[in-house]
């Protein structure tokens, strides 16, 4: 009976090998992706969009606006400045996100898990002092959980000011943007205790629509100024960084790094969605981001001498590069994308505090599980502290 069983197993293994061999090189490559930690599944790939890329997906809302504010307005955004900042943005996304996280960090996992504390668990045996950078990394993530809701949601709500139907209303009520932002933030934190499992399932599809929208509007503006792709040459970025045209000096890198906000989620959420699904979705995300940033750059080069825009305070190329009718869609999508990005970080903050508690780095706090999935946590004290801090920001 043992020999018969071994023979049957050998036949099954041979049949599998024959099946894989018959698929050809592409089929064999796809079979490898369907096994182990690199497995790709369409459903989890959609989930990865909502969990991993929400934060970095809202960066186009405010990165170029911050650049213009630092340079003194659109009048100072000449060809050298625009190509320079686009080059810095492109290569920052490439080096920090693609090279650092996708190609290097994601290979260093702790039994499939990623994140600062998972990395610490791998290296803690080399010295107790390594707890210090791990704590600093965790603290930086918690700070991001405060800043992201404030910046992303407020930048999205500011898009209402560019709509003709609401322009007069916001001009007469200067604090209206702040009040709407505060209301959305309060609603976001108030629903945490009830669990977000149901709406969380739709996050991936919404983020897919959002990135597709970014790519389309960026491409539409690129058709007016294709030469903006000269910024792919890193020489433009280095030259502008040390140029007299750069009013912000080296501090402009603070603006440039806004484009990589949330890149750490590719590593920290690797255990939730799978390494293969991140590998599979990242090329689409990067292309959409590059098209959107370069589309904004093309719009700036087309309008840098337009007196109507030069006099506009706090000009945001993201909304201005669209027609008024498209802006309505952009505002709705950007607000939803901002909420999704905030939700991912809030959930991540709960998980990180729980992990820090297990390491005895924080006092033991009350933890609730409002959803059927035990991995989804809710810590009332953390929720309240982040909410108040976000409102102050």
What are these regions, as identified by a protein language model?
Residues 1-393:
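The structured alpha-helical core of multi-pass membrane proteins
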């Amino acid at each position: 009976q043992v020999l018969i069983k071994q023979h049957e197993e050998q036949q099954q293994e041979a049949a599998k090998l024959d099946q894989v061999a018959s698929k050809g090189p592409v089929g064999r490559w796809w079979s490898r992706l369907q096994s182990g930690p690199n497995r790709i599944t369409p459903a989890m790939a959609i989930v990865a969009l909502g969990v991993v890329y929400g934060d970095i997906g809202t960066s186009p809302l405010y990165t170029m606006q911050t650049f213009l504010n630092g340079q003194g307005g659109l009048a100072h955004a000449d060809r050298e400045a625009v190509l320079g900042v686009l080059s810095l943005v492109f290569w920052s996304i490439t080096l920090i996100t693609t090279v650092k996280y996708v190609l290097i960090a994601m290979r260093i996992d702790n039994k499939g898990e990623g994140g600062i504390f998972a990395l610490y668990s791998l290296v803690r045996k080399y010295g107790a002092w390594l707890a210090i950078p791990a704590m600093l990394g965790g603290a930086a993530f918690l700070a991001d959980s405060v800043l992201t809701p404030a910046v992303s949601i407020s930048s999205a709500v500011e898009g209402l000011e560019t709509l003709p139907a609401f322009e007069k209303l916001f001009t007469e009520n200067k604090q209206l943007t702040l009040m709407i932002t505060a209301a959305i933030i309060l609603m976001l934190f108030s629903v945490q205790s009830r669990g977000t499992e149901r709406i969380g399932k739709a996050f991936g599809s919404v983020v897919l629509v959002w990135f597709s929208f970014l790519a389309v509007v960026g491409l539409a503006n690129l058709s007016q100024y294709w030469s903006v792709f000269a910024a792919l040459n890193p020489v433009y970025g280095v030259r502008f960084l040390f140029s007299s045209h750069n009013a912000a000096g080296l501090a402009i890198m603070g603006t440039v790094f806004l484009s990589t906000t949330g890149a750490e989620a590719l590593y920290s959420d690797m255990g939730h969605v799978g390494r293969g699904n991140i590998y599979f979705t990242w090329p689409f995300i990067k292309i959409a981001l590059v098209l959107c940033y370069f589309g904004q750059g093309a719009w700036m080069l087309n309008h840098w001498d337009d007196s109507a825009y030069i006099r506009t305070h706090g000009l945001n190329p993201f909304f201005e590069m669209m027609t008024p009718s498209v802006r309505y869609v952009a505002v709705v999508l950007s607000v939803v994308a901002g909420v999704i990005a905030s939700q991912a970080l809030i959930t991540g903050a709960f998980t990180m505090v729980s992990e820090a508690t297990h390491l005895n780095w924080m006092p033991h706090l009350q933890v609730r599980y409002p959803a059927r999935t035990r991995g989804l946590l809710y810590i009332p004290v953390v929720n309240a502290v982040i909410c108040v801090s976000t409102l102050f920001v």
